[in-house]
Amino acid sequence: MQPIHEYGRHITRRHFFAQGSHALGWAALASLLGPDRLAVPAAASAAADKPNLAHFPGKAKHIIYLHMVGGPSQMDLYDYKPVMQEYYDKDLPESIRMGQRLTTMTSGQKRFPIAPSKYKFAQHGQCGMWVGELLPWTAKMVDDMCFVRSMHTEAINHEPAITYIQTGNMNTGRPCLGAWMSYGLGSLNEDLPAFVVLVAQPTNTEQVQAISARLWSSGYLPGEHAGVSFRSAGDPILYINNPPGVPAEVRRRTLDGLKTLNEINFQALHDPETQTRIAQYELAFRMQASVPDLTNLASEPESTFGLYGEQARKPGTFANTALLCRRLVERGVRFVQVYHNNWDTHSNVAGRLPDQCRDVDQACYGLIQDLKQRGMLDSTLVIWGGEFGRTIYSQGGLSKENYGRDHHPRCFTIWMAGGGVKGGTIHGETDDFSYNIVADPVHLRDFHATILHLLGFDHERFTVKYQGLDQRLTGVEPARVIKELLA
């Protein structure tokens, strides 16, 4: 019997209202580990205690997902379009636009003047990948990377677009990719979560986007598979230290008493989320020892900071976050989700994009090289990209030195490295305007299917029953594994 049905058999009207009357108390206790998960619906969790649900041996055992929030400008970084120099300030042809949907921010513009990239490009590596001058460190490792220049999505605004690429659906309430991985493969370290979220602080904060905790929700999967968010300043997790005057043994006895009460509650109601809560409190207690060790960089040699850059010493920076990614994966964390904000360049590309690239360029190089030197890259899939791309036409004013770019869902670039992808691969092609895909399109569903394949899952069979349906990350529409990307 599914746990949700078992729960329904035991719950009574009195129990229902008793649960509601204790909501504030539960919310306060939940701060031991992070965002409250009591509202997470119970789901099919019969397999949740199994360590591995994979259908075949996967190449990737860990994922580090570096999400550039806002949508990086592909034609300023990776999608070289030299012919656009001849089109400066000319209107984007209607034959290219084809009446496609625009955001409300530019749909009222009388003109759509083309803004060629002001940055120089050069070819790098044996693969000959064109990389913009703002990413000199990334350019050094293109033969270790797999570039997809033909990603596309239907979502044109940030909230649905980020939700879509993280959960496979534009609607909220679905499990994210990290939760699916935790559910399917389980944890490798009982002292750390299987899924950790890090939010890096950008140097430039001109136009940051909201980053909601629902992006690392477990949705209809058991609550234990939700991401645990580490803070970028102060204690990584609230209440990681005991309150003044409360020794560890008192904290231990308190949790033991709480566990007893929760077990009594479970015997009465058979709510599977009660067991999840017990496990979360126990993990929180163990993290009091494991997390300070994780975040203490004193043991790192000077060569580490030479690799990642001096900013790696400063908590909250992208470079520091990248170093923590390696330390987390090294300790067995399955999925590390990083969010780096302020890539939403509606204006002032010249003033903002260089800062963004400086934040991430050397740090990404350091992360890939560090994993490679330690023999971890083959089993760790690193993903870099945003939720959509940018337009070739300028939003607002245009000059030779500066311009803005609106959202563009019909083509954008991501890259991956390690974890079973083929280094030195350049997949997909866009037209001369970087506006439409002309070869080898990759939809988000294909992207998700490929990631699941690298983890050892057949995306059509990796399902969980919820609300009478077999739910899956890739949904019900067609999706395929992009085999050209696989090593």
Language model features with spans:
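Ligand-binding pockets and gating/stacking loops
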Residues: 1-487
